[in-house]
Amino acid sequence: MGKVVLITGGSSGIGKSIGEFLHHKGFVVYGTSRNPERVLNSIFPLVSLDVRDADSIRLAVAKVIATTGRLDIVINNAGVGITGPLEEIPMEEMKNNFDTNFFGPIEVMKAALPQMRTQKSGLIINVTSIAGYMGLPYRGIYSASKGALELVTEA
């Protein structure tokens, strides 16, 4: 069996493309989606996971481990953008941005690390953004959430 990969946000966009590439290279890929039953034509299995819900994260990681017996690679790809002048962005949207782009990936890492430590191997890739290295006009909250994830990744 190839290395087992879990990709958050694996049902569309960059996550789906990464998953398809790795699948064709022989990796055992599991993608995640908030609504996997709505996704058509995925070439790899999708498990239900909402990065804003810690229980959902723990269940999805546990399901992959129970199915495969291991977890070799986690790609924290799920993310959401937010734009606008700071004073016009509702606080709820700001919190949702941080829950999705920062706290969600932290919860995924917390759920995956015990298995990786047991295996004595594992790789976690956190997808950030150039916006995390410099503030972009009207993208301050997004930049802050990606910058926070970048710093945790480096630590």
Predicted regions located by residue number:
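Conserved glycine-rich cofactor-binding loop
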Residues: 11-12
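Rossmann-fold cofactor-recognition segment
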Residues: 43-55
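A glycine-rich helix->loop->beta "capping" turn
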Residues: 63-76, 82
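Substrate-binding pocket helix/loop in short-chain dehydrogenase/reductase
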Residues: 85-86, 90-95
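Active-site loop immediately N-terminal to the catalytic Tyr-X3-Lys motif
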Residues: 87, 134-140
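Active-site helix of classical SDR
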Residues: 109, 145
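Residue(s) in the substrate-gating loop at a strand-loop-helix junction
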Residues: 129
